[in-house]
Amino acid sequence: MNDWLFDLGNSRFKCASLREGVIGPVTVLPYLTETMDAFALQELPRGRVAYLASVAAPAITTHVLEVLKIHFEKVQVAATVAACAGVRIAYAHPERFGVDRFLALLGSYGEGNVLVVGVGTALTIDLLAANGCHLGGRISASPTLMRQALHARAEQLPLSGGNYLEFAEDTEDALVSGCNGAAVALIERSLYEAHQRLDQSVRLLLHGGGVASLLPWLGDVVHRPKLVLDGLAIWAAVAANV
């Protein structure tokens, strides 16, 4: 039986098989709320060991864990540590560094100096030097969350729709341009500062469910949609040898 990797985020739930260190095709599962659909949970794969990375609400994580413990012989939950597989986290209290960010750094180690950007509910930015030292990062709202926040405070502002323009001439376009533009500007500023700090070239890596709307405006960027799962596979290999 295969081992399986599970990436449970705030709005997306993905999994992939893991066999002899090789990750299989990624499956996007129905996102499970606190009122979970029991049938959907029963459709989760079965295997030997399940490796779970979760930044979801505790109630959601608990529900998923309960089912995984039935479907698998063993379940291991990834957690951030100060140092792992060549990567050293900058936080004085590593447990406060999100496990998704931690795993994304593990997945990108070995690719030189990298600026790792995750676009989901939040927009996260982390700088990893080629020697494995994490040099810190930023957290902001993603463009999607920005629009949700604006709509929540001013219902007349549409939640979706519009096209990116540098100077928009209607509200929907202006919202897309402002929210996406804010994200692009923060990424570009961070990339500039990364170059200044390291005085070397820095690759820009993007992952997460919200990257599609930003990719056209970021120039030389590497899209790594399964970066967290890549990191989880590395974490799993370390855990298996402990």
UniProtKB/Swiss-Prot annotation:
Catalysed reaction equations from the record: (R)-pantothenate + ATP = (R)-4'-phosphopantothenate + ADP + H(+)
Cofactor: binding details: A monovalent cation. Ammonium or potassium.
GO terms under cellular component: cytoplasm
The protein's name in its UniProt record: Type III pantothenate kinase
Family of this protein: Belongs to the type III pantothenate kinase family.
PANTHER family assigned to the protein according to its UniProt record, in alphabetical order: TYPE III PANTOTHENATE KINASE
Top EC class of this enzyme: transferase
Sorted UniProt keywords: ATP-binding, Coenzyme A biosynthesis, Cytoplasm, Kinase, Nucleotide-binding, Potassium, Transferase
GO molecular function list: ATP binding; pantothenate kinase activity
Taxonomic lineage from the root: Bacteria, Pseudomonadati, Pseudomonadota, Gammaproteobacteria, Lysobacterales
EC number: 2.7.1.33
Nucleotide-binding among keywords: yes
Ligand binding (substrate): 91, 98-101, 171
Subcellular location: Cytoplasm
Gene Ontology BP term (one): coenzyme A biosynthetic process
Tree of life domain: Bacteria
Keyword Kinase belongs to the record: yes
